Amino acid sequence: MSQSPKVGFVSLGCPKALVDSEQIITQLRAEGYEISGTYDGADLVVVNTCGFIDEAVQESLDAIGEALTENGKVIVTGCLGAKSSASGSNLIEEVHPKVLAVTGPHAVGEVMQAVHSHLPKPHDPFTDLVPAAGIKLTPRHYAYLKISEGCNHRCTFCIIPSMRGDLVSRPVAEVMLEAENLFKSGVKELLVISQDTSAYGVDVKYRTGFWNGKPIKTRMTDLVAALGELAAQYGAWVRLHYVYPYPSVDEVIPLMAEGPFKGHVLPYLDVPFQHAHPEVLKRMKRPANAEKVLERVQKWREICPDLTIRSTFIAGFPGETEEQFETLLDFIREAELDRVGCFAYSPVEGATANELDGALPDDVREERRARFMEVAEEVSANRIQRKVGKTLKVLIDEVSAEGGIGRTAADAPEIDGVVYVEPAAKASKRYKVGDFVSVKITGADGHDLWGEV
């Protein structure tokens, strides 16, 4: 029986927080700690929190409380760890004074120091070898690749910069090495994430790095090209998330549409537009020219007809009039966005939007969100129906006796739709998790597809 100390782990929040969790767990395993799947089997528990919106704050506080009740020894990290209460003290320590330690996000060193203080590491840290790709919390065939930390924007509805700081880009060589190790470990899809993927390299003035003797600028377009070249060697996909609509995005579209990276740099953009009316965007401190955005979307699709655009929006922002909301609905219809999410505006403690005039009642905010989603789902359904009859490349995520569940290039894991694939009729057509298969699409609803190999 192993005598290695055991650490339980609870990971909450977005994919960027998940990457932080993976880095902490990788370091724990590298030092010889075991990861426990239960509270009672752990010597202590680490909880990685989210603090972006009120619901996430409460979920994190509840998770900390549960860990304290079930285990008693808890270290807290993540975005909520950087959040203050109304009295100015640390929120977590105020609500849960029995926690052993609290750190902010992206704090692997601080977390490990806290773990060492309360659960000394074993004498032989090399008992278990950690794979070069690190410990992953995602399925083996896809992984998130975080290229930077923090954000230079000051959107009025957001408190991320106050928790994660200004933009800090990872060195190109470091990013490429991680990507290569992930592909070597069997990853078939790499999801590039950050708080602001388009701004990669701004903080270091796009300095030139080197990978395998080749110069690569610390810049989104150059990094995507390098990742596309690497993905092509392994027959894999690269998908871009959190792409702020800078002009530089225009340079990435051709990489998706033609040349050696086509089919590897996926024709998929996750662009958080947030709204379409210039006055609302101005109050949000976001780019404020919807007409130019429409022109760019149309231009992107001229260059890359297969492009899928995902976006998120906020309905019921302070001061939003009915006319301004109708402008947003018109934008959704004209832009024909493929995948859309919408939040009813929710005040976030510490956000400057709380100081704006014109706060709308809860029922108005929720009613506008519902109307928005009704229009967005109609647009999405119309676009997805166009895929019926086509044969598409599908990455298989699950397999059972009933068949398989996979995703096309248009579908990111967990947030987009899926393809339900019929069981293979012939042994030669059987598939397993992580396989790419050609699927003829036979049906669709407003969100998902059905097909056969």
From Swiss-Prot:
Residues 385-453 form the TRAM domain. Its EC number is 2.8.4.4. [4Fe-4S] cluster 2 binds at residues 151, 155, 158. Its main location: cytoplasm. It is found in: Cytoplasm. Keywords: 4Fe-4S, Cytoplasm, Iron, Iron-sulfur, Metal-binding, S-adenosyl-L-methionine, Transferase. It is an enzyme of class 2 (transferase). GO terms for molecular function: 4 iron, 4 sulfur cluster binding; aspartic acid methylthiotransferase activity; metal ion binding; protein methylthiotransferase activity. [4Fe-4S] cluster 1 binds at residues 14, 50, 79. This is Ribosomal protein uS12 methylthiotransferase RimO. The gene is rimO.
